Amino acid sequence: MEELMRGKIQAYYGTDTKRLYLGDCLELLRKMKPESVDMIFADPPYFLSNNGITCQGGRMVSVNKASWDEGGDFKENHAFNRRWIRMCRRVLKPGGTIWISGTLHNIYSIGMALQQE
């Protein structure tokens, strides 16, 4: 399997045919060689951590996940989506594919960012 990263970055998990890296996606994408990835699966922030509460099993619980899920205004969130999608396109091989999960809170921005980038 060809080397994907510039420099020595240890894979979190790997076999002869695939590797999984654990870390900040923006930092890892910067270190990846252009057109080096066949498939990307992205589960970006949904921007739901807003100090709200929900009911789970009859108990009121916080919706906050962590700071990585806190959103700004629409422009900030959309700029973030454009940035990581642009970086994904750089490392994706011609003919490669990207799968992105989302909710109604972020998927429309992601769709628009895919068209813009």
Task: Give the role of each language-model region.
Residues M1-E117:
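S-adenosyl-L-methionine-dependent nucleic acid methyltransferase catalytic domains
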